[in-house]
Swiss-Prot record:
Pathway: Polyol metabolism; 1,2-propanediol degradation. The N-terminus is required for integration into BMCs; a C-terminal GFP fusion protein is targeted to BMCs whereas an N-terminal GFP fusion does not permit BMC formation. This is Bacterial microcompartment shell vertex protein PduN. It is found in: Bacterial microcompartment. PANTHER family: BACTERIAL MICROCOMPARTMENT SHELL VERTEX PROTEIN EUTN, ETHANOLAMINE UTILIZATION PROTEIN EUTN. Belongs to the CcmL/EutN family. The gene is pduN. It comes from the Bacteria. Probably forms vertices in the shell of the bacterial microcompartment (BMC) dedicated to 1,2-propanediol (1,2-PD) degradation. Homopentamer. Interacts with shell protein PduA. The keyword Electron transport does not apply. Keywords: Bacterial microcompartment. Residues 1-87 form the BMV domain. GO terms for biological process: propanediol catabolic process. It comes from Citrobacter freundii.
Length: 91
């Protein structure tokens, strides 16, 4: 799993049937303290939301086959899923 910050919303009227009715959000991975890095390793990514996250929230991401299983099956067209909203971080 990875930490990320929700940076926006994706609206897509034409998409794979397995994505119909699912909320798509833009996320950017963050450091272990929850901060956006000054020089991000990668840009924003699209994730499917399973927990009702909103813009600006710190979230947990699951990727690959684990992300697909969140939404019921291995045939889902999903590679990245938001599986949790982070309340606090401590080291």
């Amino acid at each position: 799993m990875h930490l990320a910050r929700v940076t926006g919303v994706v609206v897509s009227t034409q998409k794979s049937p397995s994505l119909v009715g699912k909320k798509l959000l833009l996320v950017r991975r963050v450091s272990a303290d929850g901060e956006l890095p000054a020089s991000p390793v990668s840009g924003d990514e699209v994730a499917v939301d399973s927990v009702g996250a909103g813009t600006g929230e710190l979230v947990l991401l699951s990727s690959g086959s684990s992300a697909r299983h969140v939404f019921s099956g291995p045939n889902e067209a999903i590679d990245l899923a938001i599986v949790g909203i982070v309340d606090t971080l401590s080291r």
